[in-house]
Regions:
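FIC/Doc superfamily catalytic core
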Residues: 1-213
Length: 213
C-alpha cells in the first residue's frame, strides 16, 4: 500500500466530526489515559497516532476476499479498542448513556447485529453498487452509535476496510479540503452531516458523493 493511501485512511478515520456529533462528556474524560493532554489539539494528536498504529492490524483483517470478517460485532469492538485504546480506558466498550445520536444503549447489541447482517447480505448478493454498500454500512453503524465517542471515525474506517476487502479504493472523505483553513473545515463538516441526514431518502447519493470527494 502506498504512503498516500495509508495517509488517506488515517485522515479519513480521524477526519471531520459533524456538527451535532457526540460531545465528550465529563464521564468520558475520566477515562483519558495520557496525562499530558491539555487541549483539543493534544487530544487530536494522540488519537491520530493511536489510529495510525491500529491501521496495520486493521488492514490485515480486510485483505481482499476477507469481507466476511468485517460483519462481526466482535470485530467492530476490537477495531475501536485498537484505534483508541492508548487514549481512552473505555475504548472498545459499549456506550452506556443516551446520546444525541444513536439508539438507546439497551438496543445497541441487536441494532448492531442487524446492521452487520444487512451489510453481509448486501455483500453476498451484490444488492447495490460497491460504493453504495460501503456508504450504507457506514450510515447504519453511525445510526447505532455503539461507542461513547469515536463512532464516526471508527465506522468511516470500517467502510474503507470493506472497500479494500473487495479490491476497491478507499473513500477520500473530502480529505483534500481538510488543510484549507477553518472555514473550509466547517464546510466539510456541514456537508458530511447533511449527507448523513439526506440518506436514505436520496438513495445515499449525497453520502457517496461526499465520501468520494
Amino acid at each position: 500500500m502506498s504512503d498516500s493511501v495509508h495517509r488517506d485512511l488515517v485522515i479519513g478515520a480521524i477526519g471531520p466530526e459533524p456538527q451535532g456529533g457526540t460531545p465528550i462528556e465529563a464521564e468520558d474524560l475520566d477515562g483519558l489515559i495520557p496525562e499530558f493532554v491539555a487541549t483539543r489539539a493534544d487530544l487530536n494528536q494522540v488519537e491520530y497516532e493511536n489510529i495510525a498504529n491500529a491501521l496495520p492490524w486493521a488492514l490485515r483483517q480486510a485483505r481482499v476476499g476477507r469481507a466476511a470478517r468485517l460483519f462481526d460485532s466482535s470485530f467492530v469492538f476490537e477495531l475501536h479498542r485498537r484505534m483508541f485504546g492508548d487514549v481512552w480506558t473505555w475504548a472498545g466498550s459499549q456506550r452506556r448513556r443516551d446520546t444525541n445520536i444513536g439508539v438507546p444503549p439497551h438496543q445497541i447489541p441487536t441494532a448492531l447485529r442487524q446492521a452487520l447482517d444487512d451489510a453481509r447480505y448486501w455483500h453476498e448478493h451484490e444488492v447495490y453498487p460497491i460504493d453504495h454498500r460501503a456508504a450504507r454500512l457506514h450510515h447504519r453503524l453511525v445510526g447505532v452509535h455503539p461507542f461513547p465517542n469515536g463512532n464516526g471515525r471508527c465506522t468511516r474506517l470500517i467502510a474503507d476496510l470493506y472497500l479494500q476487502s473487495v479490491g476497491s479504493p478507499p473513500f477520500s472523505w473530502a480529505t483534500g479540503r481538510l488543510d484549507s483553513g477553518a472555514e473550509a473545515l466547517r464546510d466539510v463538516r456541514r456537508a458530511y452531516i447533511a449527507a448523513l441526514e439526506a440518506a436514505p431518502a436520496d438513495d445515499y447519493a449525497a453520502l457517496v458523493a461526499f465520501a468520494r470527494s
